[in-house]
């Protein structure tokens, strides 16, 4: 049976325009990026499916802004990266971050894919309103995730903790919330940590 291997080094001058051509218009504004790595799968090039995909790649991007990401197709993966997949009751805590779109100065991460399971331990978004780190795995086949996310607001003293954050039924992708928040010596909240598991829906 044939095997397909691909070495890639892709420079993107406008992330937003590229995603528009790929069926995700108005999901990202501007931004430049570089994507490089190696991917392979058993079969011909046209046999490509996430279930047989293996390899590794690195993504680096600068000066872009996440807008309203579609919840269908590849938009589901984008919504994870931009944190829009977090349930509404959690994003309420970061309305200053998400209200007009999440702008980033730079974004980078290394990823390994094994038969559709994509993992990272160093994904970081340096945003103008917050710094976000993410590690864990996303299953592109079964469309679920097991991620640990830390959000560090740029102006933590202006971010209020919604009372609903710790109350009510847990819906959507969050199965466990770390209730303990990191604090600096002055008692101000400096970071929010979440464990996100479950289906994309």
Residue ranges and their predicted role:
Residues 1-197:
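Small-residue helix/turn framework positions
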């Amino acid at each position: 049976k044939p095997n397909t291997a691909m070495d890639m080094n892709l420079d993107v001058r406008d992330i937003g325009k590229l995603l528009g051509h790929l069926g995700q218009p108005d999901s990202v504004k501007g931004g430049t990026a570089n994507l490089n790595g190696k991917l392979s799968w058993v079969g011909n090039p046209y046999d490509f499916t996430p279930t047989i995909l293996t390899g590794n790649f690195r993504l680096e991007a600068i000066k872009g802004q996440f807008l309203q990401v579609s919840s269908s197709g590849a938009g589901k993966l984008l919504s994870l990266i931009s944190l829009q997949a977090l349930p509404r009751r959690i994003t309420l805590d970061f309305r200053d971050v998400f209200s007009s779109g999440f702008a980033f100065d730079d974004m980078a991460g290394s990823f390994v894919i094994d038969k559709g399971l994509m993992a990272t331990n160093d994904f970081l978004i340096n945003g103008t309103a917050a710094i976000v780190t993410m590690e864990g795995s996303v299953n592109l086949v079964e469309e679920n995730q097991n991620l640990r996310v830390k959000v560090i607001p740029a102006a933590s003293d202006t971010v209020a903790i919604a009372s609903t954050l710790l109350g009510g039924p847990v819906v959507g992708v969050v199965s466990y919330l770390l209730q303990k928040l990191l604090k600096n010596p002055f008692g101000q909240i400096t970071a929010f940590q979440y464990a996100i598991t479950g289906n994309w829906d």
